[in-house]
Amino acid sequence: MNNKVESYIGFSIRKGAAVFGVDNITVTRKHVHVILHTSSLSPKSLSNLCFFAEKIGVPIFCVEEFDILQKKNCKAIAVCDKSLAKAIIENLK
């Protein structure tokens, strides 16, 4: 199941429908559909991310540290494609 989520994240990156990092996510002008973060995200960044997710009304999930995120040295990613976000949400529930 987690391989599917990692694949969907890869698809969104290749499509250009992903935003990396807490700072970039909170200031993006793209329409965010789901936010994913790793467990190693700092508490302050996590609170900023949760506040932003609640403000715009999108789900936020904690995921494993996938290879894709480790290569980018990234702890948070937002998916801006509606269909990919829906597939990720369904696989994480």
Segments and roles (model prediction):
Residues V27-C62:
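N-terminal positively charged helical leader segments and presequences
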